[in-house]
Amino acid sequence: MSAPVTLQQLTDQLDALEQQATTEISEASDAAALEQLRVGLLGKKGRISGVLWAMGKLPGSERPLVGQRANVLKTQVQSLLAERLAAVKQAAMAERIARESIDVTAPASGIPMGHRHPLITTTEEIVDLFLGLGYSVAEGPEVEKDYYNFTALNIPEDHPARDMQDTFYLQGDLLLRTHTSPVQIRHLEQNPPPVRIVAPGRVYRRDAVDATHSPVFHQVEVLAIDEGLDFSHLRGTVMAFLKAFFGDLPVRFRASYFPFTEPSAEVDVQWRGRWLEVMGCGMVDPAVLEGLGLDPERYSGFAAGLGVERFCMVRHGIDDIRRLYTSDLRFLEQF
């Protein structure tokens, strides 16, 4: 037979457990140790449960006294565990903050910074100059219909001007646009005069890749339609733009031919001792206006187009267009 258990013995055990639990919990250094103590004190096979199991050997009148004392101890232990866990977490966070803190007075190693590609900055500068002249930006699709790329611009199917540019044809009447001029037609279909737009974008031609040609390049188209516009307005606009971009360089206009403008001209600037073609321009052909339902007796306008790569190469002294597409950091870091 097991030895008899007295009320005093169980009460003494609970008092001793209280002291032990208080000491052990206060010395626990992390959450794992506290969890181990919780199981050892409050679990089904824990030390407090062992006292409650022995309580069954007491007379019925004494059992409630032990049960009450055990419940008080459980509450105390739970409170001590919660308080210690909070303190441990706070200490761990403080240690982590101290360990991961940054000394803002230490010399910086520097983080390499990227920057915008010269073609992007050139395009943005060109567009900004025309925005300053009162123009607004218009855009159109790169996969274009034959009608907008050719027919609506006074270039019918049998027109010899179609031989002037090799085109990437797609299925049906779709193609990769060969210039940004289709934006003119699309915009005028939706917006009656007066119109002043600048249209930047990529264009595609079946050119062999060399120092001055690429099958994919960038253009900016300029269009103004209003009452009373003439060639002097075109010339004044082009001169103001070129002066703002290149500075005080000599400029000349040469008679030329474009199917959708009449008269037409090419614009050269004197650069490093030679004349360099930079733009094509002209007065919008009356046939183009009539095709849009506009009266050429009332409205007139001018258009101009330029290659962004050419402007970028002139501005930065680049001798090979392929350098702009190779993603060579040794080259791009210069800008």
UniProtKB/Swiss-Prot annotation:
Query: What is one GO cellular-component annotation here?
Result: cytoplasm
A biological process from GO: phenylalanyl-tRNA aminoacylation
User: Cross-referenced SUPFAM superfamilies, in alphabetical order?
Assistant: Class II aaRS and biotin synthetases, tRNA-binding arm
Q: Which CDD domains match?
A: PheRS_alpha_core
Could you say which enzyme class this protein belongs to?
ligase
Where can this protein be found?
Answer: Cytoplasm
Q: Name the positions where Mg(2+) binds.
A: E262
UniProt GO molecular function = ATP binding; magnesium ion binding; phenylalanine-tRNA ligase activity; tRNA binding
* Catalysed transformations (reactions): tRNA(Phe) + L-phenylalanine + ATP = L-phenylalanyl-tRNA(Phe) + AMP + diphosphate + H(+)
Q: Report the transmembrane regions from the record.
A: none
Q: Which cofactor does it need?
A: Mg(2+)
Enzyme Commission number:
6.1.1.20
| The entry's keywords | Aminoacyl-tRNA synthetase, ATP-binding, Cytoplasm, Ligase, Magnesium, Metal-binding, Nucleotide-binding, Protein biosynthesis
Q: What's a Pfam family in this record?
A: tRNA-synt_2d
Cofactor: how bound? Binds 2 magnesium ions per tetramer.
Recorded family membership? Belongs to the class-II aminoacyl-tRNA synthetase family. Phe-tRNA synthetase alpha subunit type 1 subfamily.
Q: Which PANTHER family match?
A: PHENYLALANINE--TRNA LIGASE, MITOCHONDRIAL, PHENYLALANYL-TRNA SYNTHETASE
Q: Which HAMAP family match?
A: Phe_tRNA_synth_alpha1
- Oligomer status and interactors: Tetramer of two alpha and two beta subunits.
NCBIfam families the UniProt entry points to: pheS
For this entry, the protein name equals: Phenylalanine--tRNA ligase alpha subunit
**Native source species:** Parasynechococcus marenigrum (strain WH8102)
Provide the gene name from the record: pheS
